[in-house]
Amino acid sequence: MARARRTTAAVKPRQDLAAARAGAPALTALAAPLSGFIDAKGYVEIAGVADSFGMSKSQLAETIGLGRETLYKAARAQAAKTQSRMREMLEIIGRVSAWAGGKEQAMAWYRAQPIPAFGDRTAESLVKSGQAGPLRDYLDHIAMGGFA
């Protein structure tokens, strides 16, 4: 009886999940254009993200649902919750940037466009309330040709 061989495609999602839980870099290929925001230690470079979108750190913190001062202190900026929220935001923006016409337009969509499938909530409000997973599933469904 032949054993089924595991492919890297089958292992990759688990590695991404494990890496995300460990705080290591785990942006998917869909977010590759935004992966330049990851430093050598595997943390999201907060200042780089803020500069890239023309925001202050306070505005960026508000965008991901954290306190205004959170991103100014290194220990808090590197905390698991902070890094997780940043990665979720970057992944979602990375997924829609090609559809939106660029990362700036994707950020505008993220912050302001109501999504009917989620009761007209924005992607920003979904990430803030911890519902990035269902939003990613929804975006995957749309990418595969599904209806909104």
Residue spans of the language-model regions?
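Non-transmembrane "mature" sequence context
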Residues: M1-A148
